[in-house]
Amino acid sequence: MSCPYAGNGNEHDDSAVPLTTEVGKIYGEYLMLDKLLDAQCMLSEEDKRPVHDEHLFIITHQAYELWFKQIIFEFDSIRDMLDAEVIDETKTLEIVKRLHRVVLILKLLVDQVPILETMTPLDFMDFRKYLAPASGFQSLQFRLIENKLGVLTEQRVRYNQKYSDVFSDEEARNSIRNSEKDPSLLELVQRWLERTPGLEESGFNFWAKFQESVDRFLAAQVQSAMEEPVEKAKNYRLMDIEKRREVYRSIFDPAVHDALVRRGDRRFSHRALQGAIMITFYRDEPRFSQPHQLLTLLMDIDSLITKWRYNHVIMVQRMIGSQQLGTGGSSGYQYLRSTLSDRYKVFLDLFNLSTFLIPREAIPPLDETIRKKLINKSV
């Protein structure tokens, strides 16, 4: 019996016969691989001094830019869905799915850095002279990602000029300007949080109930501290309770909160912060499950961008040290290190929510009125 997988000269080879009569494109045409795979122009090769690792350098950065394009595509679709007065649960599920996709892409980008680190500093030096004045600072797509996410111009670290001035192309500058004007993910999430059901003073009034719970919690802490037999320990506990009281005052007093926003220490409006805290407390409720996932994914995105920046900083220090200027004229390592601060963390308030937690048993219970309202599928 002949092997069904083995061909012979007498059999008709139908491997090239189309499986469909529909008009379409073959794999290479559809992906435009002729353009994609012909876009690696090694300047060292043009100079008749080819450096092997320049090819890796180009491929890695092109891969970054392709993934940046996909992140922008996802962010734009998410922003479109959030830019509505009412968002039903099916939309929330889709937003969560796409944010999760961005998280996985960013994890991949973080993991790409070690591949570039297989190149030694001497290997990099062999072709670094060809890179000037090019610089990662000139990545238009990364700047668009930052702006669409919600990095504010006034929060940026300046190195020797405004970040948008590195782009000589007017079309690129227009893209930057438009991304600064358009509602960012931060702004749209803030609007969405401000509509959290249960914040209404005429309804459940979560914020008033939360303040009452905090007051009772701190009063119980004071009573417990007063029973401490050791004077020094008692004073220490009372001092710690007063510090916590001041922390809570920073969210309960709108004037204090607004001052922190002006200073750049907070990002959300006062009401949006209330919504985020409420979702965090009641995340086990079916209605708040997806919103809580959404907030968690936003923190994941912030964290992964920070990790990517950190890995980039370490790689730059390893390749060129901490004193040399970058190829684009920036302060290189020093500038990149400065971007690791909280000023570049867009959803900083979400990271700090744990500061305001109270024990589970102290969380105000939901009444029947709010439970019925939470059955409504839209916010």
Swiss-Prot record:
Its cofactor is heme. Binds 1 heme group per subunit. GO terms for biological process: L-tryptophan catabolic process to acetyl-CoA; L-tryptophan catabolic process to kynurenine; ommochrome biosynthetic process; protein homotetramerization. Gene3D superfamilies: 1.10.287.3810, 1.20.58.480. Keywords: Dioxygenase, Heme, Iron, Metal-binding, Oxidoreductase, Tryptophan catabolism. Heme binds at H312. The keyword DNA-binding does not apply. GO terms for molecular function: heme binding; metal ion binding; tryptophan 2,3-dioxygenase activity. Pathway: Amino-acid degradation; L-tryptophan degradation via kynurenine pathway; L-kynurenine from L-tryptophan: step 1/2; Pigment biosynthesis; ommochrome biosynthesis. Substrate binds at F57, I58, I59, T60, H61, R128, T327. Pfam families: Trp_dioxygenase. It catalyses: L-tryptophan + O2 = N-formyl-L-kynurenine. Its EC number is 1.13.11.11. Homotetramer. Dimer of dimers. Belongs to the tryptophan 2,3-dioxygenase family. Heme-dependent dioxygenase that catalyzes the oxidative cleavage of the L-tryptophan (L-Trp) pyrrole ring and converts L-tryptophan to N-formyl-L-kynurenine. Catalyzes the oxidative cleavage of the indole moiety. This is Tryptophan 2,3-dioxygenase. The gene is v.
